[in-house]
Each structure stands twice: as structure tokens, then as C-alpha cells.
A protein has these predicted regions:
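Extreme N-terminal starter segment of soluble prokaryotic enzymes
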Residues: 1-5
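Catalytic donor nucleotide-activated moiety binding site of glycosyltransferases and closely related
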Residues: 256-286
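Conserved donor-binding/catalytic core segment of Leloir-type glycosyltransferases
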Residues: 221-236
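Active-site and donor-binding regions of nucleotide-sugar-utilizing enzymes
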Residues: 7-162, 310-312
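A donor-sugar binding/catalytic signature common to diverse glycosyltransferases
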Residues: 289-333
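A nucleotide-sugar donor-handling region in carbohydrate enzymes
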Residues: 139-224
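A short helix->loop->beta-strand "cap" motif at the edges of active sites that frequently abuts
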Residues: 118-121, 259, 318-321
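Short acidic-hydrophobic, aromatic-tinged amphipathic segments that line or gate anion-handling sites
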Residues: 55-59, 281-287, 323-324
């Protein structure tokens, strides 16, 4: 039987595909984008599980730019150059005939464009939890469809189309067909309830996933433990590093007492929280926060975050505190 191929750009996506691999009839192959922080180290831990037939890391920044200007150059050269950049210059190739199904979460990436360059059908998966069911109108898809001659572009494969609009997308996964808000016909949607997949994990499977994602030694006494989940406002241009440090110190002082402090930084947040909070347990920032729902031998008394949706699917805390950015900054000024 042919294996499946999973392509991941975030640690959450790796978690999703590891859960899928438990159900696979034969070990699947996995490709990790080097855009994922610590991709090589994570790849080694994944190989050690024996869950995958192979784990490769793909550095998309080394593949150059295939985009062309002008109608004829785009029509005749863009896909040829895209394949050449990946296969000849970077030395990476995929043979679609070797796989039963190809699953990818971010088809706007170099790897997604490479699949389109080769005409390989794929299943588009949710890039974050229940993203196909989110409110907001899915503006990226709507703006793409508002481009001139969209129907012709889609019919004849002119240029690249993302987020499920490419004509050879086999299916679009959703947490719930009933609750899906993406603008696609229902028959194009494929339901996979990730919440149910997490709940169905066995004790042994949870332990295996913990060995991949939980790399920080845990304290013996976790009574009253509090979890602070950060967001990197500095990289978003919303404040400077010093303001962010003061803000999180103030938030922790007010909301994170009563037990050991755990810090789970956003994957893009490179701040040194071990220095900011001496004695705190700083978890691997690349770890999906969803892992904490099942991987720890205890529950948190409280989980705290600022201007983030991370607590929406978080189930490992008795109390959840979600502050607005204005509220957190006001506490820093108090």
C-alpha cells in the first residue's frame, strides 16, 4: 500500500499529522518546512518515534523566486522555473505516484506552489484549529476571487491559486461541515474533527507525543500551577521589547501567583523568559499549546494570555484569563 505524505509548516500542524499517522494503514512520510523554529531538532525527535517512514526538512528560502511578470511569461515559464528552482537548484523532488494522498496545510507556500507546478492533487488541511469555521468572511479567499479573470485563471491553471481555489485540490478539510464558513460547496469539504482525534488518543499515544513536544523538566510540586501564554507584540510592531517585558511582568504579578509559574511563548516570540522570570518553567516555544491538554500529569489552576485566541481550545486549566492588550498595558502602567 502506498503511504500518505504530510507537509507541515507549524508545530500544531505536526501534532495534527502525528494524530493522523496513528490511524494510517502504513507509516506516512513527513516534510517539515524549515520555517518551523527548530525544525531539524523536531525532525530528529519525530524520527525516533518510528511513527513516520521518513522525515525531511525543506528550506523554502533556498528555492528562489519563480514569480514572473507579464501574461506570457507567467503562462509559459512560471511553473517550469518553480520546478527547476526546487528540483535542480535545491535538490528536492516529490514523486506524486509514490503516495496515496498528499496533505498540506499552507498551500500558499513554496511547497504548495511546487505541488501546483507538478500538477499534484492534494488535500488542503486547516492551518490552525477550526480555521475553516472562523468568523470574518475569509477575506483572503474573497480578495483572490475578486482578481481579474479569476474564473479563467482557475480553469486554465494560470498562475497560482491558494486556500483551496486551485482546480486540482482534492478536498478541503474542516473541523465541522455543519459549522464551516469557508466559501466552498459542501461536497468539496471533508470533515475531520481534530478535537475528537485528540480525545481519542490512547495513553500510549499521548506518551509518544509528549516525548516529541515536552522537553523541559517538570517540577515535582505543581500544586496551584499557573500558565502564562505569550504573544509577540514586538514583531507585530505594536510595542518595543522593554514595554512588552514590563507588561508581562505586571500581568504575571497580578494573575500568576499561588503556585509554580509556567511560560509558553508563542513560536515567533524569541524573548528570554527564563531571564525575565527566574525560577519559572519555560516550555519549548515551538510546542503546540494543544499538547498541554493531554501531555501533563496535572492541571493548571489558571491559564493567562493577552489579546490571543490561544485559550479558545485550551482545556488544561481550571480558570482561563484572557486580557485585552489595553487591559494588560494598563496593568503595566499601574
Amino acid at each position: 500500500m502506498k503511504p500518505d505524505l504530510y507537509i507541515c509548516h507549524t508545530a500544531y500542524q505536526v501534532l495534527v499529522e502525528a494524530c493522523r499517522a496513528f490511524e494510517a494503514p502504513c507509516p506516512p512520510a513527513l516534510v517539515l518546512s524549515a520555517a518551523l523554529p527548530g525544525a531539524e531538532v523536531l525532525a530528529e525527535r519525530l524520527r525516533a518515534t518510528g511513527l513516520f517512514a521518513g522525515v525531511r526538512v525543506f528550506d523554502e528560502e533556498k528555492c528562489g523566486n519563480a514569480f514572473q511578470k507579464g501574461f506570457w511569461r507567467t503562462l509559459l515559464l512560471q511553473r517550469v522555473i518553480g520546478r527547476r528552482n526546487v528540483e535542480k537548484y535545491y535538490g528536492f523532488s516529490l514523486d506524486g505516484t509514490q503516495y496515496r494522498d498528499i496533505y498540506i496545510h499552507n498551500d500558499w507556500s513554496v511547497l504548495g506552489r511546487y505541488l501546483q507546478d507538478k500538477g499534484l492533487r492534494y488535500i488542503l488541511c486547516e492551518d490552525t484549529f477550526a480555521s475553516t469555521c472562523a468568523d470574518g468572511g475569509h477575506q483572503l479567499i474573497q480578495r483572490q476571487r475578486a482578481l481579474p479573470h479569476f474564473a479563467l485563471r482557475q480553469a486554465f491553471g494560470y498562475g497560482y491559486l491558494y486556500w483551496g481555489d486551485w482546480k486540482k485540490v482534492k478536498a478541503i478539510e474542516t473541523e465541522s461541515i455543519e459549522k464551516a464558513t469557508v466559501p466552498f460547496a459542501r461536497e468539496r469539504l471533508l470533515q475531520r474533527c481534530q478535537k475528537a482525534a485528540f480525545s481519542a488518543l490512547t495513553k500510549e499515544q499521548k506518551a509518544l507525543l509528549s516525548s516529541v513536544f515536552i522537553t523541559t523538566p517538570l517540577p515535582a510540586d505543581t500544586a496551584g500551577a499557573v500558565l502564562l501564554l505569550t504573544r509577540d507584540f514586538v514583531s507585530e510592531g505594536l510595542m518595543d521589547e522593554e514595554t512588552q517585558r514590563r507588561m508581562y511582568k505586571a500581568v504575571a504579578a497580578k494573575h500568576c501567583s499561588g503556585g509554580p509559574l509556567f511560560i509558553k511563548a508563542h513560536p515567533r516570540d524569541a524573548s528570554d523568559y527564563a531571564a525575565l522570570f527566574p525560577g519559572a518553567v519555560v516550555l519549548d516555544r515551538t510546542m503546540p499549546s494543544e499538547v498541554l491538554n493531554f501531555a501533563l500529569p496535572f492541571r493548571f489552576a489558571k491559564a493567562v494570555t493577552v489579546e490571543s485566541t490561544v485559550l479558545k481550545a485550551f482545556e488544561a486549566a481550571d480558570e482561563k484569563v484572557s486580557l485585552t492588550l489595553d487591559e494588560a498595558l494598563a496593568e503595566a502602567r499601574a
